[in-house]
Amino acid sequence: MRIETTILGNLLLNEEYTRKVLPFLKNDYFTSNAEKTIHETIGDFVTKYNSLPTKEALSIELQEVKINEEEFKETMELLDDISKDTEEYADLGWLLDSTEKFCQDKAIYNAVVESIGILDNQKSSQDKGLIPE
């Protein structure tokens, strides 16, 4: 099981975990579009209703997301996998530590990729002076 799956599954099941980590999880940290869609939809639901979505509620919300049919199918398959794989709570301390490390690693990775893009002039709106020494 990947840490992304564990994170998303616990966002659905563990309210204490969700309230602690959701403000720090960015969509950019997730690799697949399905993971990004589920993360964003959970975040929107929690913001709107101040509670965790059930699998059924999330499924209904996902039907409203503007994605193509193939992405929708992948997203629903991932949701099913997450629901099956995350049937019990993991230790909160371990979850928080693992999620913090995941966020740090992804933030560093994204910064390196963006810096390479700036150096390669792929992003002409960014100045090379933005890269820290």
PLM features: residue spans?
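Noncatalytic partner-interaction/assembly domains of nucleic-acid and motor enzyme complexes
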Residues: 1-102
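Interdomain "pre-motor" coupling segment immediately N-terminal to P-loop NTPase/helicase cores
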Residues: 83-133
